[in-house]
Amino acid sequence: MGYKHGTYQTETSSDISLPIVLDYGHFIVGTAPMNKVKRENRRVNEIVRLGTYKEAIQYFGDTYDLDFSISQAIKVFFELYKVAPLYVVNILDLEKHKTVKKTQNDLSLTNGKAVIPNHKLITDTLVVKENATSQVISDAVTMWTDEGLEIYAKPSNGTKIDIEYEEIDLSKVTKAQALGGYDISTMKRTGLELLDE
């Protein structure tokens, strides 16, 4: 019986799929859940080049709520098919495309946590109050999950809280805003007009 001498290799299939990088990119104009993006990363009517899924989440939020067209694109291009680059213009402005203030009362806390099944809530506007006294709970902590917004709070009295907030209203985003235009006074393009830049 003989021995094999030297080095040998075998090749097996892998679960890791490498991203496909195109010579050209796809151009998307749409809406993104900017309520889940850090303020310094929020972009409205600016072209952002995305090369990775990490960049997509950093600038345009997660893909839990597919009511947002940019979230749909990120899911398809980066999560499903891993195709890059993607050029994205968000037209959703949290200052313009939102509802009036809403309230929810008597939210029960379980182990100090309440879950709001809402991915459009604007956390910048969220106010958490004690149910019994209506006193603001300033040290409440929030975290986004696939279920919605988790609120962690410790009321001094009882196990219920009230909240006030505004939320994104996608019905206020118009076709005209998506098509965009050129503003002579600011010398800036918006929407699809940014394709010329």
What residue spans do the PLM features occupy?
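Surface-exposed assembly/interface segments
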Residues: 1-197
